[in-house]
């Protein structure tokens, strides 16, 4: 088949760690698609000429890895919308669902409406707003639309009004968006990956182990995800298989599948949650989890399900083509 890969070239001298991974992912996907016998064409969504070429190309399926256009995260939904306008099947969920999930507040409201337990939260437009009395410290602060753990660091967990004001101010000014302030749920953290298909497959549950970290650092921040030489990265350990009872595994897996269905997703996704007092609290639904060939939690889950990287790429491609029939 003629396969198009929509991607970001990040054509600058110094790329950020997550940008290097995104670019490496698009190259790895192309390598494995060629291994499967497909013809691969790359389209840089930051390049107007490539966008024109995409509109004129005879592409049968697009493997969409684009996460932004000119550093604007809304470009993620724009790219999917363009592919839909061109009637090209693509590996991502729909542009509407992408746009819905980009804003964490909208996503939380939709989950709460459907009786999914989430951490209580409040949105701060500026640091002078009053904290709601129902939100006790400690609290967790992040941007309403930041992806890839951008804006999350060791100071994101706040324990008093002064720390809260400082973090809200940072999100408001540095990232030019409201701050999402939510109660910090203690307990264990799990990620549940979902492989799309005629019957969506719940992949083996992954636990993020923080036991080697002090209590005030037991969460995934930017360093833990991207800075491989950092202490946070080295001491944040993914665990397979998880030490859970059959009933606990069922509860966590069913919660993840409910979230997948609530959002009407039909492509690969991951649901992150905290498990405390025998209760799962959904933190986030990642409609575009990393599928980098090395180090990706989603890829590890596929491997634990019995799929190697090439087989995973083939499954995602086939799902995109079949959805369009």
Task: Annotate each PLM feature.
Residues 161-248, 254, 281:
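Phosphate-binding site of ATP-dependent enzymes
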Residues 124, 155-160, 194-197, 276, ...:
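Short beta-strand-to-turn element immediately C-terminal to the catalytic PLP-Schiff-base lysine
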Residues 112-115, 243-325:
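ATP-dependent carboxylate activation and anion-phosphoryl transfer catalytic cores
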Residues 45, 179-183, 190-191, 264-278:
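A short glycine-rich, hydrophobically flanked beta-strand micro-motif that places a catalytic Asp/Glu
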Residues 1-7, 55-58, 99-180, 185-188, ...:
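Active-site nucleotide/adenylate-binding loops and adjacent lid/helix of ATP-dependent enzymes
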Residues 1-90, 96, 125-131, 324-325:
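ATP-binding N-terminal substructure of ATP-dependent carboxylate-amine bond-forming enzymes
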Residues 3, 61-63, 191-196, 279-293:
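A short beta-strand motif that forms the metal-chelation/ATP-contact edge
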Residues 40, 89-90, 118, 139, ...:
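Hydrophobic beta-strand scaffold residues
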